[in-house]
Amino acid sequence: MSDYKEILSQEIAQLRAKLEQAQVPEEFAYQLKKEIVALERSVELGSYDEKYEKTSRYLDWAVNVPFGKKTEDTLDIQKAKKVFDEHHYGMTEVKNRFLEYLAVLNLQKQNFSEEDFSAPILLLVGLVGTGKTTFAYSLAEALGRKIVRIPIGGMGSAKELRGDSRLKLGSEPGKVLKGVVESGVMNPVILLDEIDRAADDANMDIMGVLVEL
């Protein structure tokens, strides 16, 4: 039993070390530290139960969120045009529309502070196989950003986007947060692919979650 307690204590120490190294917002870090103290207390008292599993899993995800880590945007219109032309033949109207988009981002960056700077949502519409997904990857490359692809087609539950309650054993975050964690930055391009192909019985719930996000 003492060996088991030692293993748990080492796991908690690793979580604490990760929290110290992570650039977590102050208020959130305070809450996470309270959770860690509660875990340490439960191990000391020998009261390991489901709560330990739930809390440690939550903390492990929380400390891996890349708070404060971003990629610098490359808003070079000539570079973007070169990237688009390398990956897609024709599509002149679409390319020009995206170049206009980059020009607007350039103006925003010059005239607004980083806090007020925002990139509008882009909607790619077209028949199957016309290059919507690959164009999104080209846009991410042109911007110098990482990309996270979330396939909505066939998704049967909004929980896949939002995630489960942390109180549920074996719970995990939704695909959006998972994608951000896996990308290692807070500002990846998030591609919601085949958004029109969500399962009929879950379509409204999924759209509701997207509006909320």
Feature names for model-found ranges:
Residues 167-191:
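Conserved alpha-helical scaffold flanking the Walker A/P-loop in AAA+ ATPase domains
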